[in-house]
Amino acid sequence: LHCHWRTPGFEYKEDIETGSRAAAAGGYTFVNLMPNTKPVCSSAAQAMMVEQKAAEMGLCDVNQTVSITENFDGVSIDHLKTLPAGVKFITEDGHGVQDNATMAKAFAICTQKDITVMSHAEDMEISPWDYRLAEDIETVRNCWLSEYYQTKLHMCHVSTRGALDAIQMAKLRGAPVTCEVTPHHLWFTNDTCDYRVNPPIRTADDVQALIDAIR
């Protein structure tokens, strides 16, 4: 659900051929690509171009996501209103949408169009001084929006007990929320690993909560 092939614009990091071959070698038959390309994938036309090139490779099925806000500008969502039925997911990839009204309007549009919102939860005003609160507070907001609008929401790389609790409570209230966790957030703790990722490596308590949720 969460891959970065970087076509167009950043092919020196990964391109459609290398990504397709890696997916096939790992046994993956479907991959979902993030829109952090250059230009940012903010249209169905650009998404279809990437998907067509991947289809020509013929090694795996590909879906190209579209950005929540146009060019990741944080506010413009008019492009969402014209997305065709083939678009399945929107995401701001490694950014949280900071403006509450913008995100609420995006959720409302996605409910009408049956599009799933994929969310990197990070309040950028808070993250400079508290990464944990930054993830937790935006997870709570997005779960409430999912419940209110009944918008399908997928929370990316959940890493804290608080965020997980918010997701579980939202699901109990009937919100259509799913989530994922990365291997490194299940394996490492911040007292044994000085490795910089976003979201950060968390505490042993967070790791145990994530493992328990999988079980």
Language-model features: where?
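Short beta-strand segments at enzyme active-site cores
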Residues: 30-34, 63, 118-120, 154-155
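Active-site mouth loops of central-metabolism enzymes
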Residues: 1-14, 37, 63-75, 94, ...
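Histidine/acidic residue-rich metal-binding segments in metalloenzymes
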Residues: 77-215
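Metal-associated gating/positioning segment near the N- to mid-region
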Residues: 1-57
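Alpha-helix-loop-beta-strand connector modules within alpha/beta enzyme cores
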Residues: 44-65, 108-119
